[in-house]
Amino acid sequence: MEFYASLKSIAMHVPSERVKNAEFQQFLDTSDEWIEKRTGIKERRFANDEEKSSDLGVIAAKQAIERAHLTPKDIDLVVVATLSPDFLAMPSTACVLSAKLGIENKPAFDISAACTGFIYLLSVAKAYVESGMCENVLIVGAEKTSSVLDFKDRGTCILFGDGAGACVIGRTKRLKESVLDVQISANGNFSNYLYTPRTLKPTPFNAKEEASEPFLRMKGNEVFKLAVKTLLKDVEMILEKNALKPEDVRLFIPHQANFRIIQAVREHLDFKDEQVVLTVHKYGNTSAASIPMAMCEAYEEGRLKKGDLMLLDAFGGGLTWGSALVYFGGS
């Protein structure tokens, strides 16, 4: 291989509005203590009515491109992961975001892998770069999850937040600056555990069709049990495959879904406090944006430096899951 895929830059953006747990007491039977005890979440950010996922994503994307010392014209491919796209079916949020960046005549498409979206993005970007098809790939996890939440459902609306994270994946000849390994998987037999139904309307040919509300639905207990079991196995597999141990990893950056899930994986693998990146307490579950946002916070705090090895993992609707070993190739 002449070169490897490399994570050259990372950036993030969140809306300005902070929503604390206590604010849900206005319309739900809940409390700050109840939410934090079960999830580890203290607050989250919600976008305003005018903001869309692409608006959040484009701010993060511009900074990621700048940090990679590139311009939008240098980007060969744009891929966005989101469960809250700007439009129902088309155009893709990636196309909308590309236009806002001034990128023309370059491929752009979305990935639908829910909370595992960023791991899927890494897999796609790695393949495009290492095949020689692209030199610079912009990947963006952008979510306005508040647009798909049922604020009468205590089991879901307290969990999620809005935000975006973006990375530029480029080339390197150094293995220890590369996206070392990515593994992704799915099992559609559990698709009814976590889903957003499509709104169906009657037609002149099928007047019996019933409309459904397009809000995120989740079987929380079932998802929790499967997530812990699956992630433990997946993380052990990628470490063993690459002849690595938890102590070889500089930072463990899991999807920020729920503190209890993160803690279960962390304790099983015996990660130390300084190895684990946590942001769920202040942003909630930002789905496909959570890993790049957490990665960016670590970078901006000085915890992530060039050549550091990160272990990423995620689990989401589909059901989908995945993990990655990534050396930071930025500066």
From Swiss-Prot:
Residue span of region ACP-binding: 256-260
| Job of this protein | Catalyzes the condensation reaction of fatty acid synthesis by the addition to an acyl acceptor of two carbons from malonyl-ACP. Catalyzes the first condensation reaction which initiates fatty acid synthesis and may therefore play a role in governing the total rate of fatty acid production. Possesses both acetoacetyl-ACP synthase and acetyl transacylase activities. Its substrate specificity determines the biosynthesis of branched-chain and/or straight-chain of fatty acids.
Its subcellular locations are:
Cytoplasm
- The record's principal subcellular location, in a coarse class, is cytoplasm
One GO biological process this protein is involved in is: fatty acid biosynthetic process
Residues forming the catalytic site: C115, H255, N285
In the UniProt record, the gene name given for this protein reads fabH
Q: How does it assemble?
A: Homodimer.
Q: Supply the InterPro entries for this chain.
A: ACP_syn_III_C, ACP_syn_III_N, FabH, Thiolase-like
Task: State the superkingdom.
Answer: Bacteria
Q: Which GO terms describe its cellular component?
A: cytoplasm
SUPFAM superfamilies the UniProt entry points to: Thiolase-like
Tell me which UniProt keywords the record has, alphabetically. Acyltransferase, Cytoplasm, Fatty acid biosynthesis, Fatty acid metabolism, Lipid biosynthesis, Lipid metabolism, Multifunctional enzyme, Transferase
EC number(s): the record gives 2.3.1.180
Note the PANTHER family from the entry: 3-OXOACYL-[ACYL-CARRIER-PROTEIN] SYNTHASE 3, BETA-KETOACYL-[ACYL-CARRIER-PROTEIN] SYNTHASE III
For this UniProt entry, which residues form the secretion signal? none
State the name under which the record lists this protein.
Beta-ketoacyl-[acyl-carrier-protein] synthase III
* Protein family according to the UniProt entry: Belongs to the thiolase-like superfamily. FabH family.
Q: Which organism is it from?
A: Helicobacter pylori (strain Shi470)
The first-level EC class reads transferase
Q: Name one GO molecular function term.
A: beta-ketoacyl-acyl-carrier-protein synthase III activity
Q: What is known of its domains?
A: The last Arg residue of the ACP-binding site is essential for the weak association between ACP/AcpP and FabH.
Q: In which pathway does it act?
A: Lipid metabolism; fatty acid biosynthesis
